[in-house]
């Protein structure tokens, strides 16, 4: 209800990101060398992590956004563990300009999902017999800019 100063109307026009639901789409954890891999290690394992962000528009203001986290500790025959998590959420975006929609979907939505995906990985690694793996925070804005640069670099250049 408006209070005479247009407060309700202003609130109705404010940009909003609503997480409607979050869910695990796919998850895999492998501990291929257990129980041998669970003993003391001579040196710290090489940990590799890849991050991918995908999005799909479901309706005019609804988007499904996925973070895919793939990682491993160790290499080759000395692999301690591997994981792959596809964690997603459905977001309703309101009052966001068309120019801002893509960055919001690809930066802000994954930023909201990441802490939950990070905890799933940490819990799985701990349940696999290892100390929990807490993935460092991800700069989704930098990841977005990098992806835009890659797309621009692969696009055919027009000669004038």
UniProtKB/Swiss-Prot annotation:
Organism field: Beijerinckia indica subsp. indica (strain ATCC 9039 / DSM 1715 / NCIMB 8712)
InterPro entries named in the record: SecB, SecB-like_sf
Subunit structure and binding partners: Homotetramer, a dimer of dimers. One homotetramer interacts with 1 SecA dimer.
Subcellular location: Cytoplasm
Purpose of the protein: One of the proteins required for the normal export of preproteins out of the cell cytoplasm. It is a molecular chaperone that binds to a subset of precursor proteins, maintaining them in a translocation-competent state. It also specifically binds to its receptor SecA.
One GO cellular component, as annotated: cytoplasm
UniProt xrefs under HAMAP family: SecB (MF_00821)
Keyword terms of this UniProt record: Chaperone, Cytoplasm, Protein transport, Translocation, Transport
Annotated signal sequence range: none
Assigned protein family: Belongs to the SecB family.
Gene: secB
UniProt entry tagged with the keyword Magnesium: no
GO MF term set: unfolded protein binding
Protein name per its UniProtKB record: Protein-export protein SecB
Cited Pfam families: SecB (PF02556)
Single Gene Ontology BP annotation: protein folding
């Amino acid at each position: 209800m408006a209070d005479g100063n247009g407060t309700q109307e202003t609130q109705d026009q404010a940009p909003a990101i609503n997480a409607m639901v979050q869910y695990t789409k796919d998850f895999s954890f492998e501990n291929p060398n257990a129980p041998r891999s669970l003993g003391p290690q001579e040196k710290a394992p090489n940990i590799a992590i890849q991050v991918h962000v995908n999005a799909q528009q479901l309706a005019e203001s609804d988007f499904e956004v996925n973070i895919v986290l793939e990682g491993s500790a160790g290499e080759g025959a000395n692999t301690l563990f591997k994981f792959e998590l596809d964690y997603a959420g459905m977001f309703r975006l309101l009052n966001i300009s068309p120019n801002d929609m893509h960055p919001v979907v690809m930066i802000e939505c994954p930023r909201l999902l990441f802490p939950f995906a990070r905890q799933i990985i940490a819990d799985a690694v701990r349940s696999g017999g290892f100390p929990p793996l807490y993935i460092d925070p991800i700069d989704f804005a930098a990841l977005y800019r990098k992806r835009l640069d890659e797309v621009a670099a692969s696009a055919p250049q027009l000669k004038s």
